[in-house]
Regions:
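RNA pseudouridine synthases
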Residues: 1-140
Length: 140
């Protein structure tokens, strides 16, 4: 079993479109000519289902940003970016998908767990939150 958990800083806080935790399920269409991925209403040729589970860990005091933990159930191109942006919560720094914040895209692989293929030993790796903006907003 291979488990990878991501962290992202997203615009805004929990609301009707994005409760404090949940599962996001969408159909995504990858337009290679435009270099973008779009959510669509129904399956059709070239469309793939995208599923992720998330939890809002903390929201900044002014409500402008939130820290989210994300586990992918599928691994689609730009999946995390598109699924949050389609709910009006783009990732910090992600101008391609609607962020008004300038900077690097605030998406990080936070934890990785798997069973070593030779020894069978459980392996686990994790990264701390970066000390740079916008992550430092959520450091204790």
């Amino acid at each position: 079993c291979f488990l990878k958990t991501y962290r992202a800083v997203i615009a805004g806080g929990p609301d009707e479109q994005l409760p404090p935790e949940g599962i996001l399920r969408d159909y995504l269409f990858k337009d290679s000519r435009k270099g973008r991925v779009f959510p669509v209403k129904r399956p059709r040729k070239g469309v793939r289902e995208a599923v992720l589970e998330y939890r809002i860990v903390e929201t900044a005091p002014d409500g402008s940003l939130s820290l989210a933990e994300i586990t992918l159930h599928t691994g689609r191109t730009h999946q995390i970016r598109v699924q949050f942006a389609s709910r009006k919560h783009p990732l910090y720094g992600d101008g391609k998908y609607g962020s008004r914040f300038k900077g690097d895209i605030a998406l990080q692989s936070a934890r990785l767990r798997f069973v070593h293929p030779d020894t069978g030993k459980p392996m686990a790796f994790s990264l701390p939150l970066p000390a740079a903006a916008p992550w430092k907003e959520f450091l204790e």
